[in-house]
Amino acid sequence: MESSDQAARWAKTRFAEIVQGGGDIPLDEMAFLISAIVLGPGSSRVSDSSEIIEQMSRLDELAAAVPSPTFGGIAQFLFTGPDAFVGNRAEYYDPENSLLTKVLDRHAGIPISLSVIMMEVGRRLGVPIAGIGMPAWVAATMPA
């Protein structure tokens, strides 16, 4: 594995390449790069492209487990039941609630990170789900 400095530089460089490249921005990859930049290598489990792919496979696995590939089916799968993702009300302002690697580990986050998971699972299943910015919140919806 790369040294901590090299890994952090790699994540920042990759982030800049994506932003400056024009075209579509891969939400999942960007979210994992943010985790790597904020937490640093090792603690975020994202320090090179192979680890990004490994983290994205976690979203692939979630999508593969959705029994009904519809907006409602995805929401029900992700947000109900014993292994549901939940809002972290007790520690709402914990920065880790915004970091996708940590949210996937803990199954707890804030509306924006939970919406990213829902949008990315939907994208993998061909179900269009968009984020809607609201004052102090983000919610997921089906585009018109």
Annotated model-derived regions:
Residues 1-144:
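A structural boundary/capping signal
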